[in-house]
Amino acid sequence: MSEPSKEQFDEVVREYIDFVNEQVGAYMSALAGFAGHHARFSRQVHRANRPVSTRPPDETGMPTVVWASYEDPSKPDIIHNQIIRSDEYLEANRPGGANEQQHSRSILIFLFTYWEDEIRPRLARAKGVEPNEIQADIMGDLRTLRNIILHSKSVLRPDKHASLRLLGEMFEVNKELEFTYEGMHRIFVLLKQECARLLFGWLGVEDGPVKPEELKDVAIQFGPGRLRKSEPDAP
């Protein structure tokens, strides 16, 4: 059995809810950034390719290249971190494109790793049980997706698809995992619902006014007799 902890169970759950919310914010900001890049460079490509003489333009258009750098482009000898054809750049930044997929995969791996290595052991200590007694179907699915992303080049094999309890219908067998906006939103909601289920179980709520699977978001409010622990002062 885990060593007893001075942490309250609901405090640890709240920390994970806050962490999920941070990832939701990062995901939405990233999508906005990709969309902005796509719109801005689409206009620039059209301006670069438009005809500037009376002769008909090439049917395929002039080849254009995107030069990207974190440094000031007006300065000489800057280092370009990316040189890519404009069509490939636009394809990567389109809705559902490679950049969105890469970001979605990173977030899901981050969500599972923080749960498995940090939150789950602390929940177990707060409850006085072993970590493997803290179980959640959505976390099992995230573990499977993490392993597919890291070890199978994101290709979903039949045996792994069969092991998905909640997210199986989101993906096709023997194809690369593809995360849509709607799919990511569903995963975020399922994570919040799981946090609610953990709280209901800890509080002993069996017949509440709502069920965890009916919730879309979760917030924990501490009463006047129960204040959150303040952060330690910086040295």
Predicted regions mapped to residue ranges:
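A short mid-domain helix/strand-loop element embedded in enzyme catalytic domains
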Residues: 76-91, 109-125
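Extended intrinsically disordered or low-complexity regions, especially N/C-terminal cytosolic tails and loops
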Residues: 1-102, 133-137, 144, 161-235
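Short, mixed-charge amphipathic alpha-helical segments
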Residues: 124-164
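Long, hydrophobic, amphipathic alpha-helical segments used as structural scaffolds
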Residues: 115-127, 150-157, 199-206
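Short, hydrophobic, well-ordered secondary-structure elements
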Residues: 100-120, 139, 143, 147-150
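Amphipathic, heptad-repeat alpha-helices with coiled-coil/zipper character that mediate oligomerization
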Residues: 68-73, 106, 110, 151-158
